[in-house]
Amino acid sequence: YHTLLSRRFDRTQEGKRIHFASAMTLLGLEDGDNATNGHGYLDIVDFILQNCTDVECNLQELYRRVAFNICIGNSDDHFRNHGFLLTAKGWTLSPAYDMNPTLNAYQSLLISADSNKANLNILFGACEDYMLNRKTAEKIVSEVIDAVKNWRGLSIRMGLSKREMDMFARVLDERIITEIVG
């Protein structure tokens, strides 16, 4: 069995707490608030615009995460799985967490004003809602696609067994064919 040990992003090296809050908390939302009742990533965009430091960087990072979620089929992208850290300069996106590949064709959250379909073309169409121009959006998505296409090499370097890789292959290869290639 493999065990993943990760460094907590809500603690300093000395063990002191860095304030963390989920997007659900900061947006004043409740469990179950998602695409079905009109909520989505653009709610997070609004929070970033109004409350975050380094707005441009945070918006680009959010867009990158949406693209990644689409590319791996992570539909567990509800508001509790997005968070912010309070730094001396203000709120900033926390490191990404709880991202798991699936074959789902829809996101939990709207990726545009009116769609939660896991589709990069819909995300491209919404790039200005994320305050990005098309060129920047295309660059971000290209980087995400390159990373996802190279999942096998990373898996080998990380020591995943053939059995584990075979489990992920069905999901990731299907997503690559559906979203990236075709």
Functional labels for PLM-detected ranges:
Residues 1-182:
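Anionic ligand-binding catalytic core segments
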